[in-house]
From Swiss-Prot:
This is a key enzyme of plant metabolism catalyzing the first reaction in the biosynthesis from L-phenylalanine of a wide variety of natural products based on the phenylpropane skeleton. InterPro entries: Aromatic_Lyase, Fumarase/histidase_N, L-Aspartase-like, Phe/His_NH3-lyase_AS, Phe_NH3-lyase, Phe_NH3-lyase_shielding_dom_sf. Its main location: cytoplasm. GO terms for molecular function: ammonia-lyase activity; phenylalanine ammonia-lyase activity. The gene is PAL-2. It is an enzyme of class 4 (lyase). It comes from Solanum tuberosum. It is found in: Cytoplasm. (E)-cinnamate binds at N267, Q355, R361, N391, K463, E491, N494. Keywords: Cytoplasm, Lyase, Phenylalanine catabolism, Phenylpropanoid metabolism. Contains an active site 4-methylidene-imidazol-5-one (MIO), which is formed autocatalytically by cyclization and dehydration of residues Ala-Ser-Gly. This is Phenylalanine ammonia-lyase 2. Homotetramer.
Length: 590
């Protein structure tokens, strides 16, 4: 008799538990379940603080397995750092790198057949050759197919910050000793980075599978001294390969690539993952910044602070939402504006809305999932920049070359598409808040367009800024469309599916730039709103003092010196002052 569904589930559950306990006992987790779970534990804010601390460190030490998004961003932004930052290679990696390089040379001499060493490339891998060095030289030649504009910073040249980051990521991969390349080549690339010399790479031309072949070939072209190779020096001047080597202090002349070395340099996801690292470093900071801006928005809008109540968010269970609410609650705690708003809400409560609009009240619920997406993408990219992502992989311990597809940059394309959608959602909420802030129908007593001029018929404040914000938000929403569903079969249908990782990362970089524009505009508007609330507070204080003094003189004592019942009108008059929107004069037709 066949077992029931319930029996099957019970048996499967016991098997899973036995396997799990066995894995834990032997310290063997083949799918890294526990590591993946641990990576998303803890506070997102603490993670961002740690990222900023790492970004500020003067040295990036590479060993192949501990590179972070913040370190990649640090190398990318070396132009903007007063003290610079240097890369150091782990000497302990030298032996493993040398072993894989020696294995390739030994296998070549023994006649072992390996892809890209004795064969052609891609769809033409059926071809064979014994001229391994010449094969690598021609690999670089045919991959140098990029198109550049005029000048060192043309719109068709990859930003030099991204190039430096890509060199760092590629070194980190090659240090792990599975790629068959000499350690001296990695040292030369390190010298280029430390001298702030960036090879000129084309902005476009890669599908990030098989890796970022075309752009990475220009790094290889500089190392081998190809005549078309150009670089940009520390002062922004254009250098040829010979000048770049001299400035960087690379001695011994250009490299004559040995078998597999050209493939090791170009067949990886370094450019896409480097750009993604830069994007995610900034995205994490922008997400935290918007949590702060949302709290300020609640403050200047006289919002009801209960939207951050811990029980509400605890019952929803989502960690991003819980932390966003906690951060906003911390910022609002003790705010004099919040206390003043509480008094206003208690005055004539039945004549006012019971709760705030969604842009304020549900901001933690809206932001939380976006923050979780950005955080998950950050972890995915950190795994990618510490991965070995070329082909074939040299396994010296088993004396074999493994042919696979780690060059497929799907983690980059998917994480960047998701990040871009999260950024667009953040921008959407920001625009909704901005629209409420400048609209006197919604902003609880602030002047229309946040104007503070004497003549409201001439001063229109943030009207132009609101139009600009609409433009930014529209473009940001367009960029939220995915890139990865636009795959085209490439290279004679060998690369019939590809990740489009760098393209997606580039589009996400555009989204980050637009969100920066929105954030800076919004911050200025919030500062204006704070000033207006402070002005409102001061003016009300002056008016109330004046009303109180006049009331005491004119309403307290009668003609014959007796106490006048009208003295009790003082409290009512002061309440009228509190109820009145101070800036209502701006649209008063009188």
């Amino acid at each position: 008799m066949a077992p029931s569904i319930a029996q099957n589930e019970h048996i499967n559950g016991e098997v899973k538990e036995v396997l799990w306990n066995l894995c834990k006992k032997q310290n063997y987790l083949p799918l890294n379940w526990e590591m993946a779970a641990d990576s998303l534990r803890g506070s997102k804010l603490d993670q961002v603080k740690k990222m900023v601390d790492e970004f500020r460190k003067p040295i990036v030490k590479l060993g192949g397995e501990t590179l972070t998004v913040a370190q990649v961003a640090s190398i990318a932004n070396v132009d903007n750092k007063s003290n610079g930052v240097r890369v150091e290679l782990s000497e302990s990696a030298r032996a493993g790198v040398k072993a894989s390089s020696d294995w390739v040379m030994d296998s070549m001499s023994k006649g072992t057949d390996s892809y890209g060493v004795t064969t052609g490339f891609g769809a033409t891998s059926h071809r064979r050759t014994k001229n391994g060095g010449t094969l690598q030289k021609n690999l670089i030649r045919f991959l140098n197919a990029g198109v550049f504009g005029i000048g060192t910073e043309s719109t068709h040249t990859l930003p030099h910050s991204a190039t430096r980051a890509a060199m760092l990521v590629r070194i980190n991969t090659l240090l792990q000793g599975y790629s068959g390349i000499r350690f001296e080549i990695l040292e030369a690339i390190t010298k280029l980075i430390n001298s702030n010399i960036s090879p000129c790479l084309p902005l476009r031309g890669t599908v990030t599978a098989s890796g970022d072949l075309v752009p990475l070939s220009y790094i290889a072209g500089l190392l081998t001294g190809r005549p078309n190779s150009k670089a940009v020096g520390p002062t922004g001047s254009k250098l040829d390969a010979e000048e770049a080597f001299r400035v960087a202090g690379v001695t011994g002349g250009f490299f004559e690539l040995q078998p597999k070395e050209g493939l090791a340099l170009v067949n990886g996801t370094a450019v896409g993952s480097a750009m993604a690292s830069i994007v995610l470093f900034e995205s994490n900071i922008l997400a935290v910044m918007f949590e702060v801006l949302s709290a300020i928005f609640a403050e200047v809008m006289n919002g009801k602070p209960e939207f951050t109540d811990y029980l509400t968010h605890k019952l929803k269970h989502h960690p991003g939402q819980i932390e966003a609410a906690a951060i906003m609650e911390h910022i609002l705690d003790g705010s004099s504006y919040v206390k003043a708003a509480q008094k206003l809400h208690e005055m004539d409560p039945l004549q006012k809305p019971k709760q705030d609009r969604y842009a304020l009240r549900t901001s933690p619920q809206w932001l939380g999932p976006q923050i979780e997406v950005i955080r998950a993408a950050t972890k995915m990219i950190e795994r990618e920049i510490n991965s070995v992502n070329d082909n074939p992989l040299i396994d010296v311990s088993r004396n074999k070359a493994i042919h696979g597809g780690n060059f497929q940059g799907t983690p980059i394309g998917v994480s960047m598409d998701n990040t871009r959608l999260a950024l667009a959602s953040i921008g959407k909420l920001m625009f909704a808040q901005f629209s409420e802030l400048v609209n006197d129908y919604y902003n609880n007593g602030l002047p229309s367009n946040l104007t503070a001029g004497r003549n409201p018929s001439l001063d229109y404040g943030f009207k132009g800024a609101e139009i600009a914000m609409a433009s930014y938000c529209s473009e940001l929403q367009f960029l939220a469309n995915p890139v990865t569903n636009h795959v085209q079969s490439a290279e004679q249908h060998n690369q019939d599916v590809n990740s489009l990782g760098l393209i997606s990362a580039r589009k996400t970089a555009e989204a980050v730039d637009i969100l920066k524009l929105m954030s800076s505009t919004y911050l200025v508007a919030l500062c204006q709103a704070i000033d207006l609330r402070h002005l409102e507070e001061n003016l009300k204080s002056v008016v109330k003092n004046t009303v109180s003094q006049v009331a005491k003189r004119t309403l307290t004592i009668g003609v014959l010196g007796e106490l006048h019942p009208a003295r009790f009108c003082e409290k009512e008059l002061l309440r009228v002052v509190d109820r009145e929107y101070l800036f209502a004069y701006a649209d008063d037709p009188c």
